Amino acid sequence: MKFILPFFFLFSSAFATEVRRWEGLEAILNEDFQRIEKHAKWAPRTLSFEYARAEENTVTINCEGLNFKLQVTSVPHEKTSTLYHGLFQLGFLFPHPRWQISPSLDKAQLACGKTFTWRPAFPYRGFHLHTLHPNEWVQGFLEGQTDIAMDYVRWLARNRQNIVDVSIMRPKWEGQMASLKAPFALAKALGISRGVSLGAALQQQNSFRLIPLFSAVSGIGDEKHLRKNIKKLNDNLDYDFMTMEIGTSEFTSTDYEKSLNWMNITAAELSKEGKKLFTKNHVSTNQVSKKWGNFNLLPRYASQDVGLLPHTVMFYGLYDENAPMYGNKNFAHMLKFIQEENDKRDIWYYPETSYWVFMDQDAPLLLTDYLKVRAKDMEGLYPEKIEGHFNFTSGQEMGYWLFDWNVALNADLDMEFSPLSALKLLGEDLNLWESILDYQNEHFKEKSLISIISFSNLQDEISKHRIHHRNTLKEVFRSSLIREDEIQRLEAAIAQSPDVSGVKNEELRLLLEVTNLRLHHALEVRKSMRFKKKSSDRALALKAAESFRMEAQTRVNVITKSHSRYPTARLFDWRSDITSYSFGSLWTAATLHHWKREERMITRENFNPFFDNIVNFMDIIF
């Protein structure tokens, strides 16, 4: 008996802990169900659920009158996702954290008596919130507007996601920790693993770093600072994993041996607390050692406790033949890296649905290739059996909720990795959308029109190391060959532009119209270069460009007025926060700043990188 008792108490204790966790989760889920019922205008307690542990993730919809009981069986870590899979089968949709689509009771009853299996494509699936950019999540997670963060955490759970991380910064650090506590507590209760994104020695964009720059470069006190700041973070925040930059910036490396040492120390320190380290593996170039090779792939030599986040940028993916970003031909080397390391350590693929830096939602351009490329990458990686899919996002306004939602939906194997999963659920005309996707893929991506209709940033204009391969406006102005080539390509694309008037969602339709108007605007800007500075012909061409801009502005005004879901975050305003930027993430989109800048540059023939520049380069660096 004395040998049995310890095992009895051990089992009882573990069982009691699991029961308490379930009771806590049950209360939170009931609260969320009440919130969903209220929004749907259903009677209270129309929805209920029961849970039992099992090896297969299933949910059975049992109905009694107008009441629905979701009978959930699953492995423990999929209980929340399996439950919300039941709501999905009833017809509840959550395209955006502040947008719920509810079924009628009659439609929901079509699921009665049926059993559905939840089949996730990846064990871990979720989003990195890039709060180094001045988006809604800066206010929500880091600056105390907790309702924004709580809505987002619920959106993750409702869309069957189970990982999230947030970039933390140096300014007002204590306030950030306080602001993170409530949403991180809710995420934990819902079974969502929570991470913090930071740098070992990252200097750019106010990022929090574990080692001060001097110590990182000199090696003096680097390990002491590293351990001290890991402890500081652990003492102030309950989190599950850390994602770490290993260079001083995305484009500049630190000493290779030191960097390996920092990774190994960090992984070991985190492991003591039951936490996990992942390192970001960028696609930037020109960081190569004869001994160690590509600095971005250096973590392959670290302890196997160090996980990987292989990154791709913008609307390019692992299987694209051409990905002219950061001096690359494509990202085939990143796919090879994944395949070589997959059996050795944890890997979460780390792509994007919004780049933000003058390229997509802040232009604004609604780039539908994000739907195509993310679906293709997920489908390609599923047979590789990688552990996770971790999508980088810079915000969901200006229609970019569509791309994040499609990624979340495609974590469900039943969706078959379709680029149209979200649009189908929205009841859109799929034939029309296929023509839109095919058109943008051909012209914007394959024929590289994106380099013409997006905008050069400060780095593009002051150096030859371009973010995206492009001709700057100065180069177009100085070369008639370049100018006429770009004019010809724009005219060809405009001639084949599909009619988007049949798009049902107003926000998406307006953004597609704005995107098409940008083609016309870019064309007129280039046509104006054919004529002398003060000629009437140039003035007429620039007037035409202005006219297209004003047409776009009319549509943007409707979007900012009727489809602004975070008014307190002031995303469309000129304002500051703890990031390196002096404006909300969508101020340039709301004002069409970049469009006006191009017109003014031609009018004045002023191509100075700092002309009408809104980014403080020193703030970005320091």
What are the language-model segments listed below?
Residues 3-12:
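Sec-dependent N-terminal signal peptides
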Residues 47-49, 59-61, 68-72, 164, ...:
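Hydrophobic beta-strand residues in large extracellular and virion-surface proteins
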Residues 17-18, 40-54, 96-106, 195-199, ...:
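A generic structural motif
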Residues 50, 62, 128-130, 245, ...:
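Residues in well-ordered beta-strands of folded domains
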